[in-house]
Amino acid sequence: METALAIIGGGPAGLAAALAARKAGVEDILVLERDTVLGGILNQCIHNGFGLHTFKEELTGPEYAYRFIRQVEEAGIPCLTDTMVVDLEEEEGEKYITAMNRKDGILTIRAKAIILAMGCRERPRGALNIPGFRPAGVYSAGTAQRLVNIEGKMPGRDVVILGSGDIGLIMARRMTLEGAKVHTVAEIMPYSGGLKRNIVQCLDDFGIPLKLSTTVVKIHGKERVEGVTLAKVDERMKPIPGTEEYIPCDTLLLSVGLLPENELTEERGAKMSPVTRGPLVNESMETSLSGVFACGNVLHVHDLVDFVSQEAALAGKAAAEWLKENGDNITEADLVLEQAEKQETAAGRMQAEKTASTAADRELSEKTTESSKPEEKESHASHAAAQEQQKHAGVTDVGLEYQEDSAAGKEDMWQEKRTAITVESGAHVRYTVPSKIRPDKAGEETLIRFRVDNVLKDHYLCVSYDGELISRKKKRILAPGEMEQAVIRHSDLEKYSNLSRITVHIEAE
């Protein structure tokens, strides 16, 4: 099986990326989804609050997903559901995906470009090292959400929730609405990990207490959870003796973090961020692996699905551009016109259009010819092999780009490019996405998304170019649970021809 663009994941990121790629001109797209239906995690998120940025109206999770699913179906984009991707490989510039499903067994899919949109998973109890037995009644918040919203089953009636991530906060409200008693939400950090609006709507409105700097130190019960012991923690996250509190319950829900599903990415050797546990990407969402893009929660955990869709659309469009640059679904005339768009003078534009017209006529003539010339095929094959050899030799890494000029007898031309600019996190910033910006590839503006490391009030969001402060914007409050963003405008980058480093940092008043 072959495809120009393979998208791994049929959730909100994968669907948005597929639509963006199709709109950008990619006809050959294949979406691979391990679940039996498209939509990803949105199918179990029956609460509202989705779509305010994308559709300018408030939707539930399934409604938001259905709008994208319908567009994908109308666009005729093929999707393989109930299909698990188990391996990614690359040989001689070709990417190979190994997947399996019940109908076809083992599948090998050759793709020219890949978009990773596998989402994330919840951190399990085993990662917490909580003392006690392993009784029934301990669930991740996402599992409990699926049981209640999809399968119609109640995990328990007396509930304690550990962790104040958005899923945990939403499940506190959901369990209460279903008749359960939620005793408390305990959070080991001195601040909540979820959105402020979820704290208000899911806890405050229902009288559910939030205990900060508190964790579960013991789970009681052998066959079924009978209760938990909570304790305060110090600044090193160690339980403080004498602060223990026993709460009887039959269910413990864990909302203690999300981990991007990046086993495939790591096995392929992509450069990874130790903070987000996702791949490092440039302004086009391209990883360190050429032609492999990433978006959504597989890249870094988002709090709003609208931002996932925006990021995925960027990845889809960038993948389409990458395919065009690498000779897929693009004619010789298109290449000449594309080069003309980069020329500044009107004379250059007119000459290129004339050349493009000639190239288009020649292509039409060649298509009507019954027989092809073997020597021309050999010439194109050797040229492609030489281009691939140049790519492997690291030519593109040192800032040079190959272009073909059919009007000049297909002479080799080299266009100098500026070196990629490193984007780094400064004071109180945990990470930045993207981590590189290529000025020649950046659009009118590039969004840098990041999270802070603590709750900060009346601070300034600052952006510096090689240590020089460029912008300083006051923020009334910054919190780790809410993603922030800074805008880098291309017009500003043009003023700094030798720029090597952009730093995003937070300053006090």
Predicted regions and their residues:
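Beta1-alpha1 glycine-rich phosphate/pyrophosphate-binding loop at the start
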Residues: 5-67, 71, 146, 155-199, ...
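Predominantly flavin-linked oxidoreductase catalytic cores and closely associated redox partners
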Residues: 106-107, 116-209, 218-220, 298-301
